[in-house]
């Protein structure tokens, strides 16, 4: 056996090797060994114990979830009870840490108070209006930014229906207003490419009845920007500090809704030349003017907010308001000349049923100084005279009588003021 290279010891060693390699010979159908069964059983028991443990944990988590829901509902009810009115209005001054702050009350006292955990800390900014608990003075709510109820922003359905075509004449004024107000809002890149800053504000001045407010209405109609209209006298309030606060609210509202246009009519009510004021009311008006100047200087050119001001007394305005950088463009609205009269008459009478005998050129050629409002009043009065006589056509005699009535009335008013 040794001669042919077969050793007995090696042969004996190969016999158990055959038994070990039996699973590879396709005899696995004979089933696992007893040792394998014991391993599988022990593994099964272990998994069963883990399953029972997980089931117990699941029940515990469900019970804990129910308890947390009850606590959450209880906490919500507690927060509602804490925030229930009446509450004390205060002012947030400074945050000490995440849970406490210093607030000021309406009585003038400052308090070191706790902050309700549900309040968003990002809303707590200096001078923000907050609600304090009536007993503990704890800070329980953050009020929205203050805005005066008289400040109205015209929505798309509230904007006037006055169009540029409804305004007779004033071609130069229309062009200047559109260049200073509309163009920077719609094509700001043009100014950027040229390398100049667009006008910040526009002053419209001229005699009464020359179309200043009407042109502002047309701007509001044709632009998609937010339009805020206030009258200068609205800033003069009863209590000290209310007027400057209202000015801040107007500009804050405009910045929040940019692009926006602020139209301040009768600006001479608060922007007259400053003098040595002797009364508290005069000093308050001057403080309103200072706040207005500050807000106009604080304009960020990246914010699309434009200011339009209108007045009949441009000579009484403070020079600080008129300087370039605040009101860059000043547009005069003079009494209409002959060409402007013709355009205004034709625009107003375009919707009227006039007789062929009515010669508008005769009224245009008359030398009387009349404004656009006077021309509109003449046309309206002639229509009323036709209605009085149950006619559907306005005759020449109606126009003549209306013209004399309006012009005579204006002369009497002027003589009265003299």
Curated annotation (Swiss-Prot):
Instruction: List every position bearing N-acetylmethionine.
Output: 1
Paired cysteines (S-S): none
Q: Which residues form a coiled coil?
A: none
> Where, per the database record, does this protein carry Phosphothreonine?
25
Span of the secretion signal?
none
Judging by the UniProt lineage, the source's domain of life is Eukaryota
Q: In which residues is ATP bound?
A: 206-213
**Do you know which SMART domains this protein is assigned to?**
AAA (SM00382)
- N6-acetyllysine PTM sites in chain numbering: 397, 401
- Which GO cellular component terms are attached? ciliary basal body; cytosol; membrane; nucleoplasm; nucleus; proteasome accessory complex; proteasome complex; proteasome regulatory particle, base subcomplex
Phosphoserine PTM sites in chain numbering? 21, 28
Q: What does this protein do?
A: Component of the 26S proteasome, a multiprotein complex involved in the ATP-dependent degradation of ubiquitinated proteins. This complex plays a key role in the maintenance of protein homeostasis by removing misfolded or damaged proteins, which could impair cellular functions, and by removing proteins whose functions are no longer required. Therefore, the proteasome participates in numerous cellular processes, including cell cycle progression, apoptosis, or DNA damage repair.
Q: What is this protein called?
A: 26S proteasome regulatory subunit 6B
Species: Homo sapiens
